[in-house]
C-alpha cells in the first residue's frame, strides 16, 4: 500500500546554495505519512481524540541528490511492516517525472497512550493496515 504527494521546494527549505537542507526531508516524510494515514481514514487529530498517538521512534534518510528551489518532488510513502504496536514506513523522494531519485528513507512509529506508554494499535487501525496493506 502506498500514497504519493507532491511538494514544491520552498525557498525556506533550501540552504545558501539553493539545495534542500537535509533536515527538511524529515518534514516531507511527516507530510507524506500524515496524508497516507488520512487517505486510509485515520487523520492524526482523530486518532489523538481517541487517546492514541503515533510517535516516531526511528528515522533514517539516504540522500542521493538534492532537488533545488522551486522543483516539484514526489514523496511516495510505502507501508512496511505492521506490528501489534508499531508501523514501519519507507519513502522514495523523486522528481515529478520519477526520473531522478533524491532520497530514500525509513521511519518506525510506535503507538502510545496519552501518558506516552506503548500500547497496541487499535483494532480498527490494525485491521485496515493489515487487510488493505
Regions found by a protein language model. Name each.
Residues 9, 15, 37, 42, ...:
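Residue-level signal for pocket-adjacent positions within structured domains
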Residues 1-36:
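Catalytic strand-loop segment that frames the active site of acyl-thioester-processing enzymes
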Residues 7-11, 63, 111:
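Hydrophobic residues in beta-strands and at strand termini
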Residues 3-5, 38, 68-69, 80-133:
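HotDog/MaoC-like acyl-thioester-processing domains
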Residues 36-87, 103-104:
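Hydrophobic beta-strand-centered segment that forms part of the acyl-chain substrate-binding groove
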Residues 19, 52-54, 100, 119:
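Residues that recognize and position ribonucleotide moieties
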Residues 25-28, 53-55, 90, 108:
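Residue-level recognition of specific faces of alpha-helices
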